[in-house]
């Protein structure tokens, strides 16, 4: 067991792996990471699946079966991804049971092409939930304006949700409201809300990539001094919002009925700038009740040389506010930054989804011949 990762878990940060593949499942690697790297959750996305399915032979048998049945490419994608997610859910079921449903969660994303279609997103979430048929599943729904009512409706039906692609503080506040509204509707319908869970995936490194590009164009010493500070400041203030919202009477009523809080999940935590410490977005975002989902390279880096100095979020709220104020003074429009990132985030997942469809369409053709 890695001491840095054990220490991170002890500090209240749930360690999740941002990756999945059939090879990782079948070789026992995921189970090994659960044993030796404190991994208690898994996130996936269309990009991860496209790379996994296009890069190995472990899917060939299922592809042949699907080709023989003559299924269309959409059904094939759902069958293949659901099989991997179901197996990962089973591997992490002990963590789910041990934590009373808090951890041991595995996330599967709805078709990203539906990011701006509320009703179709809800229908897709329901279909994926039934297809995987595991209580420790999270359905990933993007935090677009159309996604917010879909999040509420999905939670109201008793389906656990990972809200993804959150960049803006005001959007995060809307996400928490959508979460509570969904639980209130579920409770009114007589559901046991203790079984309905959620995380809010707040993206980190992409904020620095966008802001640092704008700072480079400004080019002043003050702008240079603010490089690689925006993302951490933004995330820290998100946690402050989390503390505020989940101490309100509204939340206390839900908690009394058995609800679990919607934990902040730090996503996009690998550093894009090679000049930065490779564990930066882990070390600087430590606080109780959070999740950090890491690609394997970041996970192994933290296992090797990560440091847990204690809570690195709550003592730094004023510094975080100062960073965002200085960015505004320099002319960096954070509202525009987060809007650009949301549009790009949806587009990137749509592109990966289309590549995934192309990959499976090609492999179905090869398997049938």
Curated annotation (Swiss-Prot):
Task: Note the HAMAP family from the entry.
Answer: Transaldolase_2
- EC number(s) for this protein? 2.2.1.2
Catalytic residues as annotated in Swiss-Prot or TrEMBL: 140 (schiff-base intermediate with substrate)
- Its gene name is tal
Keywords for this entry? Answer: Cytoplasm, Pentose shunt, Schiff base, Transferase
Q: Which InterPro entries match?
A: Aldolase_TIM, TAL/FSA, Transaldolase_2, Transaldolase_AS
User: Sorted alphabetically, which SUPFAM superfamilies does this protein's record hold?
Assistant: Aldolase
Keyword Cytoplasm attached:
yes
- What top-tier enzyme class does this entry carry? transferase
**Which transformation does this protein catalyse, written as a reaction?**
D-sedoheptulose 7-phosphate + D-glyceraldehyde 3-phosphate = D-erythrose 4-phosphate + beta-D-fructose 6-phosphate
Of the GO CC terms on this record, one is:
cytoplasm
Q: Which NCBIfam families match?
A: PRK03343.1 (NF002881), tal_mycobact (TIGR00876)
Upper lineage is:
Bacteria, Bacillati, Actinomycetota, Actinomycetes, Frankiales
What Pfam family is a match, any one? Answer: TAL_FSA
Q: Which organism is this protein's natural source?
A: Parafrankia sp. (strain EAN1pec)
Q: Where in the cell is it found?
A: Cytoplasm
Give the record's GO biological process terms: carbohydrate metabolic process; pentose-phosphate shunt
Q: What's its job?
A: Transaldolase is important for the balance of metabolites in the pentose-phosphate pathway.
Q: What is its main location?
A: cytoplasm
Which molecular-function annotations from GO does this UniProt entry contain? Answer: transaldolase activity
Put simply, this protein is called Transaldolase
